[in-house]
C-alpha cells in the first residue's frame, strides 16, 4: 500500500501543480478518482502505451504496473469505501463500451475483480446522445446529484468505443464544528491589491498545527468526525506566494511536514472561508503533457489487453469535481530537517486563511489523498 500511496500522492501533487500552472484560479480534483480510473485502463494497455501510463501515474517505482499495482488499488478502494465509518465516502467506477466492439473477457473480469467496475455496453454508433445522457445519469446517481453533466454535449460521437468513468462522493462533519453565529463577512486577499468579501467562519479549538520555516507556511489539520479523514491546509505567510509553496511541495515533504511528531496539538483560533468549488477538466491535454501520449493516438495506442480489435484508443478523460466547506463540515464529490515552531507562552496561535491556500482531504490510515485543491478566489 505504501508504494501505491506514494505513487498516488506524487501524481496528485503533479496534477495539482499542472492544473494551476501560471495562474491564480481555483483548482479542485480527486486524484484518487483519476488515478484509479486510469489504472483500470492500464489493465488493458501493453507496450509503450502501458509504460507511458505507469510513468504518468508515478507507478514505475512500485513494481511497474504489474498485478500488485491493481491489488494495491483493490485494497485501497475497499479500505476507503468501508461502510462502518462516520463519514459518507463512495467511489464508483464503470466502463461504457461500444456494443459492437469485442472486449476481452479477461479485461472485463480484471476490472470487476480489482475495481468493482462493470462493463456496460452502449450503442454509441446510432444512439450517441442517449448513451451520453445515460452515462451522465449514472454519475449523478453515484454522487448524490452533485455531478450532473460529466460529459458535455458532443463529447461522445459515433466513433466512440470506450468511455471510462469514475465518480467519488464525500460528506463529512468536522470533529468540532464552527459556530454559525461567528461567521461574518470579511475580506479575502486574492492578490496584493485585490480583495473580495468571503463568509469567514471562526472557531477556537484544539488542533494540530505547525509552521514550516523553509516555505514560511502554517499547516493546520482539521479532523472530521471519527478522525479517519482530515483536511490538511497549507497557508503561506502574507508575504509568501502560493506558487512558491507549490513549487517546493513534494509528496515526501508533504508526509514529513504533517508527521505527528512535527505537529503541535494546541488551542488555535481558526478563520476559514465558507466555500463551494465546482470544477470540470478535460484531462487529455494535461495527461499528454505529463507524457501519456500514445493512449490517445489511434495509430499508436496499444490496448491489446482489452480487445483484439484494432484502432482502440482513449478519446476522452473527463473529470468533474465538487466541494462544499461549511460550518458543519465538508461535502465533496468528484468524478475521478527538524522543523521548529516558534512558541510563545500564553499566545493562542491564529490560523487566518484570508488569502490563497492549498487544501487536501486525506485518509488517515492509508495516507491516500482523496481530494486536493487550491482556493485562490471566492
UniProtKB/Swiss-Prot annotation:
Q: Which GO terms describe its molecular function?
A: serine-type endopeptidase inhibitor activity
Name of the protein: Serpin B6
Q: Which domain of life is it from?
A: Eukaryota
Fetch the CDD domains from UniProt: serpinB6_CAP (cd19565)
User: Which SMART domains does the record cross-reference, listed alphabetically?
Assistant: SERPIN
Q: Which residues carry this modification: N-acetylmethionine?
A: 1
Q: In chain numbering, where does the site feature Reactive bond fall?
A: 343-344
Of which family is this protein a member? Belongs to the serpin family. Ov-serpin subfamily.
What SUPFAM superfamilies does the annotation carry?
A: Serpins
Write out the annotated subcellular location: Cytoplasm
One Pfam family name is Serpin
GO CC terms, sorted = cytoplasm; extracellular space
Q: Which UniProt keywords apply?
A: Acetylation, Cytoplasm, Protease inhibitor, Serine protease inhibitor
According to the record's subunit comment, the protein's assembly and interactions are: Forms a complex with the monomeric form of beta-tryptase.
For the modification N6-acetyllysine, which residues carry it? 196
Q: What does this protein do?
A: Inhibitor of cathepsin G, kallikrein-8 and thrombin. May play an important role in the inner ear in the protection against leakage of lysosomal content during stress. May be involved in the regulation of serine proteinases present in the brain or extravasated from the blood.
Amino acid at each position: 500500500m505504501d508504494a501505491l500511496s506514494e505513487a498516488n500522492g506524487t501524481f496528485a501533487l503533479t496534477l495539482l501543480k499542472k492544473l494551476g500552472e501560471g495562474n491564480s484560479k481555483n483548482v479542485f480534483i480527486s486524484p484518487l478518482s483519476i488515478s484509479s480510473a486510469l489504472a483500470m485502463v492500464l489493465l488493458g494497455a501493453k507496450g509503450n502505451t502501458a509504460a507511458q501510463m505507469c510513468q504518468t501515474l508515478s507507478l514505475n517505482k512500485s513494481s511497474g504496473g504489474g498485478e500488485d499495482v491493481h491489488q494495491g488499488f483493490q485494497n485501497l478502494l475497499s479500505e476507503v469505501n468501508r461502510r462502518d465509518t462516520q463519514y459518507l465516502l463512495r467511489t464508483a467506477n464503470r466502463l461504457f463500451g461500444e456494443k459492437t466492439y469485442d472486449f476481452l473477457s479477461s479485461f472485463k473480469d480484471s476490472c470487476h475483480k480489482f475495481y468493482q467496475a462493470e462493463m456496460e455496453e452502449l450503442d454509441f454508433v446510432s444512439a450517441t446522445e442517449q448513451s451520453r445522457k445515460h452515462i451522465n445519469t449514472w454519475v449523478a446517481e453515484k454522487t448524490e446529484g452533485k455531478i450532473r453533466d460529466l460529459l458535455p454535449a458532443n463529447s461522445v460521437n459515433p466513433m466512440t468505443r470506450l468511455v471510462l468513468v469514475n465518480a467519488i462522493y464525500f460528506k463529512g462533519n468536522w470533529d468540532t464544528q464552527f459556530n454559525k453565529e461567528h461567521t461574518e463577512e470579511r475580506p479575502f486577499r486574492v492578490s496584493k491589491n485585490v480583495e473580495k468579501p468571503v463568509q469567514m467562519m471562526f472557531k477556537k479549538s484544539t488542533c494540530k498545527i505547525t509552521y514550516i520555516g523553509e516555505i514560511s507556511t502554517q499547516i493546520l489539520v482539521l479532523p472530521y468526525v471519527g478522525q479517519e479523514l482530515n483536511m490538511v491546509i497549507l497557508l503561506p505567510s502574507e508575504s509568501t506566494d502560493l506558487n512558491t509553496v507549490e513549487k517546493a511541495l513534494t509528496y515526501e515533504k508533504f508526509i514529513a511536514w504533517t508527521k505527528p511528531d512535527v505537529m503541535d496539538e494546541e488551542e488555535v483560533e481558526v478563520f476559514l472561508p465558507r466555500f463551494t468549488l465546482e470544477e470540470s477538466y478535460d484531462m487529455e491535454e494535461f495527461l499528454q503533457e505529463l507524457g501519456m501520449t500514445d493512449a490517445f493516438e489511434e495509430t499508436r495506442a496499444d490496448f491489446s489487453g482489452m480487445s483484439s480489435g484494432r484502432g482502440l484508443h482513449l478519446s476522452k478523460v473527463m473529470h468533474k469535481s465538487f466541494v462544499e466547506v461549511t460550518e458543519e463540515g465538508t461535502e465533496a464529490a468528484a468524478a475521478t530537517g527538524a522543523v521548529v515552531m516558534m512558541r510563545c507562552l500564553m499566545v493562542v496561535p491564529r490560523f487566518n486563511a484570508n488569502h490563497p491556500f492549498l487544501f487536501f482531504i486525506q485518509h488517515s490510515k492509508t495516507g491516500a489523498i482523496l481530494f486536493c485543491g487550491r482556493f485562490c478566489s471566492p
